Amino acid sequence: MENHLSSQIRTLSYEENEDHPVFGTLVEQILHLLNSRLVFSDVIIHQNSPLMLRQPKGLVAVTDSPITREELEEFFEVIEPNWSERIAERAFDRSIDLHTARIRANCFTFQGKKRLGCVIRRFPKEPLALAGLGLHADEQAFAKFGSGLVLIIGDTCQGKSTTIASMIDDINMHRSGHIITIEDPVETLIPQRKCIITQREVGIDGDVDSFYLGALDALRERPDVIVIGEIRDAQTAQEALALAESGPLVLASLHARSTEMGLQKMIRLLGNSDAQSQALAHALRGVLCQALLPSSQGNRYHLATECLTVSPALMALLEAGDIAGIRARMNGGRDLGCHTMNASLERLLAGHKISVEDARAATTDRVGFADLV
C-alpha cells in the first residue's frame, strides 16, 4: 500500500486501481470510478490534490496526480453552464446523468475562493429493490400504508434517500396513484409503472423554492403519496403533518440520531404544544432510523436499523409526550413491528459482520449497548 506524498492518506495500490485511466478528462476519470469494482460512497475533489474516495474504512487517494483548476472548471461546465455565477454566490448542488450512472455534485470554493472543490455522491439510475436493502419485514411494510406520516431518520449520508426511493418504487409497482416527491436535488429517477410520478426539485433553478412551498402545493395536486426530502424547519414540519392528516401517505426524511431524538425534534418543530403532540400521535404510522456501518473487511457497508410501528399503546405515550416511555417499550420488545438499534447491531456483531467500535459509534443507546459487549 502506498501513501500519498503530501499527506497521511493512503493511495490505492496498482492492483486495487488497475482499471483507472492514467489519462483522460476529469469526467472520464469519474465515469471509470463509477463503473469500477471499487467500493466507495463519495468522490472528493480538491484543486491541486489527487482524486479521493470515501471508502467504508476511510479516505483513499486514487492516484498521486493532482487535479488542476482547468480540469475542475471543465467538469463544472458539464454539470452547470452558469457555474461561475453560481459558485460566486455560494456552493451549489447538481444532479445529472453520466451515461451509466447518476450523481449529485456539490461544487464550492475554499481558501478565500482561491481553490475549487467538489464532492460527488453516486446514486442508482433506478431505485434498488426494497427487499434487497436489508430492511426487516416490518420496515418494508411501511410502503404498504395508505395514509399517515412515516419518518425516515438518521445522520447525514446513512442511506435515507435510497430507502425512500425504494419504498416509493415498491408502491409504484403494487398500486395505482399519483406520487409527488419534493427533493433537493432530485436524486434517483423513479420510472413510471402503475403510478404517475411527479418529482419536483427545490432550488433557484428548480420547480419550487422550498420544501415548505412544495408541500403546500402538493395538497392541491391530488397526491396519493408525498415525499418530503427533508424536514428542515417548523413550517415544513407543520405542513407535513397537515398533509398526513388530509389523507395521503407522507414519507419524510429528518436528520436525527435516534427514534426518540427524531420524535423530540418533530414535537419541537411543531411548537411543543399538547395539541400538536396529539395530532402527531394520531397521524404518525412509523419511524425508521438507520445507520450504515463498514464491514469488518472494509469492503462494503451493512445497514443497521431501529424501527417504531405505532400501536395504540405507543400512540397514547406520544400523545402524552412521554418519549422516555416509548424508548422503554421498545427496549422491552413489547410492541409488534418495533425493534431497537441495539438489536440490529447485536445480529451484525453475532455474524462477525461489523466491529465493536463501529457498532458502539452507531448505537442509539450506549448504556444498553454496554450490556451487549
Give short role names for the model-derived ranges:
Residues 2-373:
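Short, flexible helix-loop junctions that flank or precede catalytic/ligand sites
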